[in-house]
Design a protein with these regions (language model features):
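N-terminal secretory signal peptides and thylakoid transit peptides that target proteins
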Residues: 2-18
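Short, flexible active-site loop motifs that bind/organize anionic cofactors or intermediates
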Residues: 1-2, 195
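Basic side chains
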Residues: 8-9, 98, 274
């Protein structure tokens, strides 16, 4: 990682948190007292502070984890927004850009190295693990709080894996997923972990979605998803009337914000300032942006509550990251598979 100068309504598990994750706040006596495995100890030993101002932490999770473990969440009436895009051309190959817009809370840059699935790099809002701003200040010195990070692998907000497959989500007004006969039911955020673990490209990611029944719990905010891969292929995944709809990208680019693409007409798309701004830039450049240009585009559609702006280089496993709209300080990370 290096830092160099450069001149909600979003949620992960379905709904923004009004409070903390109750299950992670209290925990059971067994989970608190259970001895850590060797992989868990090794994982927590990698924890470090990247940027104390947000704060942003980083950790590598080694070994196995349960992507379907339950994490209790509380809903919120607040409405926030996100912006995502694929820029398929340019000197560094396909780029996946993403603004995550939500209230201030600590974040974790998580590298997962499971024993059998793909290695991945993702960002996690750890308030969903019961670590709010105050708890974040104590995290490095509090063993119980650090232990909660072992659940973070289950809830990526956006990320890329070693094959160059990226995924991110944004909230919409409505989503009615199909009930797949005989399929395992998964949460609206956990499906992203399954995609990062199991898919190498967009086609395989779509197949992962089809293997599970995605469920939005009562009170949760519905979502749609953007997929992109190292070949420059992309697709949006939406749920309309009990049907999963797959919307391929328009040539070398794709654009997604907070309305249902598959039911929106052209006037609705153009009336959304963020969508229009991204689409006009990508159309004008034929999707050819370098990482600095992609970050500049994210800055143009950032809002006052933008938590992070991330640009993933899908052929190189690299990420550039700006926190809280500070585009003069850019953090750089690389996923070494």
């Amino acid at each position: 990682m290096s830092t160099v100068p450069l001149g909600r309504r979003a949620v992960l598990l379905g709904a923004p948190v009004a409070g903390l994750a109750v299950a992670c706040q209290s925990g059971s006596a067994d989970s608190r007292d259970r001895a850590l495995t060797r992989d868990e100890e090794r994982s927590l030993a990698t924890l470090r502070t990247v940027d104390a101002s947000l704060p942003l932490f980083a950790m590598t999770h080694y070994g196995t984890y349960d992507p379907l473990q339950p994490i209790a969440m509380a809903s919120s009436p607040q409405r926030f927004a996100c912006s995502l895009f694929l820029a398929g051309g340019g000197p560094r190959g396909p780029l996946f850009g993403r603004n995550f817009d939500w209230r201030p809370s600590p974040a974790l840059l998580l590298t997962t190295r499971p024993s059998r699935e793909a290695t991945s790099l993702s960002l996690v809002d750890i308030s969903y693990l019961g670590i709010d701003q105050d708890a974040g200040k104590r995290l490095m010195d509090d063993p119980e709080l650090r232990r909660r990070l072992l659940k973070a692998a289950a809830i990526p907000f956006d990320g890329v894996n070693q094959h160059g497959l990226a995924i991110g989500m944004a909230a919409v007004d409505t989503a009615q997923p199909p009930k797949v006969p005989g399929a395992r039911v998964v949460g609206s955020g956990r499906i992203q972990r399954l995609v990062l673990d199991q898919a190498r490209n967009v086609d395989e990611a779509v197949a992962v979605f089809r293997r599970y029944t995605v469920r939005f719990e009562p009170g949760e905010v519905p979502l749609h998803y953007l997929l992109a891969d190292a070949r420059g292929k992309s697709a949006a995944i939406e749920f309309v009337g009990g049907e999963m709809r797959v919307l391929p990208g328009a040539g070398d680019w794709h654009d997604m914000v907070n309305f249902v693409l598959s039911t929106a007409d052209e006037s609705e798309k153009r009336s959304d300032t963020r969508y229009r701004t991204i689409a006009e830039r990508l159309r004008r450049t034929n999707g050819r942006l370098d990482p600095a240009g992609a970050m500049d585009l994210l800055s143009k559609v950032a809002q006052h509550h933008t938590r992070w702006s991330a640009v993933y280089e899908l052929r190189h496993g690299e990420m550039t990251l700006a926190l809280a709209r500070d585009y003069r300080r850019i953090h750089r990370f690389k996923l070494d598979a």
